[in-house]
Design a protein with these regions (language model features):
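Short, flexible, basic/aromatic active-site loop/helix in glycosyltransferases
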Residues: 82-83, 97-114
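Acidic donor-binding segment of Leloir-type glycosyltransferases
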Residues: 1-28
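Non-catalytic, C-terminal membrane-associated alpha-helical segments of glycosyltransferases
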Residues: 183-187, 201-270
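Acidic donor-binding/catalytic loop of UDP-sugar-dependent glycosyltransferases
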Residues: 5, 9, 58-71
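Conserved donor NDP-sugar-binding/catalytic core segment of glycosyltransferases
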Residues: 63-93
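Acidic donor-binding loop at a coil-to-helix junction in glycosyltransferase catalytic cores
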Residues: 141-147, 154
Length: 270
């Protein structure tokens, strides 16, 4: 559970919203430690036909809701995926993530098994939850893909990509945060493999890691460094390979060490 003054911050936000004629409801989910359980709590408390999802580390742009909701004018649409851009950061890793377009929904929508959108920017029609259930509350990662895949494979609801419905995401600023992020991505791979049989990424060996790092030092860095010195490309491009390698190593480790807990197979219902 949060210990960073979240309740106090929300109480202050509630008062400010009330002064502007808006309503904010502070809901608490403290029985199950997962973001998906928290989302289920909010879904049950909601009364609207369209539910919009974003994350605490995201900043929706003006007109986000209107652009996200617009495709639902088509009664056949059950799922709308908005785009995720980087919130401009100061650290090297934040700038790297922005340069790599990390977390763009275009990547997840191109998933070879089935398209999906991340809950950082997602709209779902309430009727969908009545048909296929809520998020798996005991999943700790991969629940957004699971939800979208259940919609895509078990229903006739259409998915629409609303590229102009934008949120900005605050990327990881430290090595520790980056490691945690990519380990979690690896666990997600494993969980979705156990639920759907999707392919796992191949295991990353230290021998391959040494080879790729050596290749970067001897071949890629001299070329990319010269290009950066000449002002043709950003310096970030010159150091992207070792960061990519670090991410891949941690994703592989997360996948290798994970196993889907039995309770995580449970689907809650409205």
């Amino acid at each position: 559970n949060s210990s960073d003054r979240t309740p106090n911050i929300l109480a202050s936000a509630q008062k400010e919203a009330e002064s502007q004629g808006l309503t904010i409801r502070h809901l608490t989910e403290n029985k199950i430690q997962s973001s998906y359980a928290a989302r289920n709590t909010a879904i049950r408390a909601s009364t609207g036909e369209i539910l919009a999802f974003t994350d605490a580390d995201c900043r929706p742009l003006p007109q986000w809701i209107s652009h996200l909701v617009q495709p639902f004018a088509d009664p056949a649409v059950g799922l709308v995926v908005g785009e995720i851009n980087a919130l401009p950061g100061e650290t090297l890793l934040e700038k790297y993530a922005e340069r790599q377009s990390m977390m763009t929904q275009k990547d997840t929508l191109a998933h070879p098994f089935c398209p999906y959108g991340q809950t950082a920017n997602l709209g779902i029609r309430r009727q969908v939850f009545a048909e296929i259930g809520l998020f798996r509350p005991y999943m700790t990662t991969g629940g957004d893909a699971d939800m979208c895949w259940r919609i895509g494979r078990e229903t006739a609801w259409k998915l629409v990509f609303a590229e102009t419905a934008l949120v900005q995401h605050r990327h990881r600023a430290t090595i520790a945060e980056l490691k945690s992020q990519w380990r979690r991505y690896g666990r997600s791979n494993r969980y979705l493999h156990e639920l759907y049989g999707v392919d796992l990424m191949r295991d990353f060996t230290w021998k391959e890691s040494v080879y790729r790092l050596s290749r970067w030092l001897l071949k890629e860095l001299p070329v990319a460094g010269a290009s950066a010195i000449a002002g043709k490309t950003p310096w970030l491009d010159a150091i992207a390979s070792p960061i990519n390698l670090y991410c891949a190593i941690n994703r592989s480790a997360g996948q290798r060490e994970a196993k889907l807990p039995e309770p995580a197979k449970t689907i809650e219902w409205l």
